[in-house]
Amino acid sequence: MDSHIHNDTDDWFNDLDQKSIQVISNKLIPEESNSSDEEISLENINSRSNFIDDNDKIEHIFIEDILKKDVVNLSSNELLQYQCSVAYFIQVLFEGLNDSNELIANKSNFNIKTTSDKMNSMVEYLEWISGVSEILAKRIGQQIYQFIPDRNNTITRSSYNFCPASTQCKKFYSKNENPTCKSHHFVHSLLKYDVDSVIYYLKHNNKNGSFNTDELNNLHLSIKTICFVTRHMAREISYIENITKNNSEQFHRNNPADLTKKKSTNVSGKKSWDSVSTIRTHKATKTFPQNKTRQCSNTKTTTKSTMTPINNGFKESPNQILKIKNGVNRYSILSEY
């Protein structure tokens, strides 16, 4: 490697040589405007304001300390905050501790500087996020799905339709009724499926040593999507934790949201909707192993991977849509706490 070629990507541990990461406090998580699904995927996640203000005081924690925590016994709020922080750290690593626009503009240097070891580290962190998503999904009764790669090794990005009412949604945050909101609130199963697709993609391409510009653009967007989704859920449960005086676990639950549509993105960046097909349910009996690399399935299929809808006894109507005027309360519906 040419010793004269240098950028922050090559020295990704210079500023974070102890693998410390930034943990976002409640007040540093920005407000999110009402957005359509496409706006969430393409606009919001590309905004640096969705992350942190460099002038704000933040707490630091070692990433290895997070990975060593007993995730089974942590609260859902704690897991989501840590998951959000690890996802943000992955994005920082991918962007080379530098401005993302500069990174995107010079992919040739990225291919030179991003070594196999660094990619393996990102895979390790993504596997931790996947394992935590599985734990959280099981807590609220969401069905777990095993990712099955297609022949082209495409990355799958789901269509996230977060509830515009958020913590003010009467159809989700009701103490005496099961949630009836059709929009997304806690999407652990969906997130795990998408993260697993990125893990497989990284393992496959890192082994072959091939990442072209289109692939890196697509990978970059997927990582930012994961970061955005974890941030959204962390902010929502953090608010509930605060308003209920540490009783957010009661309101961390599943709802009959539509999880049937997923987008597979090929290397050219073109998105296509997956048709519903069969998918194997992952029936893991072991708890999530700490700091252990799980084997990724090599199963091939000619049918694109897809997610079947979660069914926990709710009767869904495809024509029933949450309307803002009926789903929002001016005052917190949990204000009695």
UniProtKB/Swiss-Prot annotation:
Residues covered by region (Disordered): 291-314
Ranges of biased composition (kind: Low complexity): 299-308
Superkingdom in the source lineage: Viruses
Name of the molecule in the record: Uncharacterized protein R203
Protein's organism: Acanthamoeba polyphaga mimivirus
